[in-house]
Amino acid sequence: MISDDTDQFNPRDAKSPEAAKGKSAKRREARQMATQALYQWHMAGHALNEIEAQFRVDNDFSNVDGAYFRELLHGVATNKTEIDTALSPCLDLTIEELDPVELAVLRLSTFELLKRIDVPYRVVINEGIELAKVYGSTDGHKFVNGVLDKLAPRLREVEVKAHKR
């Protein structure tokens, strides 16, 4: 099991369904925190390290995969140009016209599709939809779903084709 004060993984726990649930629940929390932090970064323009530090101080991270939160936050910022370039052909709007919450969700999901091939594309899409339901506008989750459904085959062509067989 991943202990609360380290990010060490014990392989024995990988066999346990409870461990898998715990890991995915902690990743879901990391995605939620990262979405909020990315929104703040986009809106306020504060330094990423300051935002990360603030989130770690102001929030209970005992149920958050802290390393994944950091990877998502910094990964989106570092790869923003690549992410936006991948997203743009799947949008009916420009990046600047997007709702900031949906933009944060789409950037996070696109980062996972591009850089975290260990996370199945269907999980990425589902998590993006759930984030948009929680934080986005009334029908934001439908918009996010539509964009990610267009994006996944472009970024994960082999995986998507294999799944559709």
UniProtKB/Swiss-Prot annotation:
Could you confirm whether the keyword RNA-binding appears in this record? yes
What keywords is this UniProt entry annotated with?
RNA-binding, Transcription, Transcription antitermination, Transcription regulation
Q: Which superkingdom, per the lineage?
A: Bacteria
Q: Which InterPro entries match?
A: NusB-like_sf (IPR035926), NusB_fam (IPR011605), NusB_RsmB_TIM44 (IPR006027)
Locate the region Disordered: 1-27
| CDD domains in UniProt | Terminator_NusB (cd00619)
Entry GO MF terms:
RNA binding
A Pfam family the protein falls into: NusB
The UniProt entry's GO biological process terms, in alphabetical order, are:
DNA-templated transcription termination; transcription antitermination
The Basic and acidic residues compositionally biased stretches are 10-21
- For the keyword Transcription, the answer is yes
Q: Per the UniProt record, which residue ranges are transmembrane?
A: none
Q: According to its record, what are the GO cellular component terms?
A: cytosol
Q: What does this protein do?
A: Involved in transcription antitermination. Required for transcription of ribosomal RNA (rRNA) genes. Binds specifically to the boxA antiterminator sequence of the ribosomal RNA (rrn) operons.
Family to which this protein belongs:
Belongs to the NusB family.
PANTHER family on file: ANTITERMINATION NUSB DOMAIN-CONTAINING PROTEIN, N UTILIZATION SUBSTANCE PROTEIN B-RELATED
Specify the protein name: Transcription antitermination protein NusB
Species: Pseudomonas savastanoi pv. phaseolicola (strain 1448A / Race 6) (Pseudomonas syringae pv. phaseolicola (strain 1448A / Race 6))
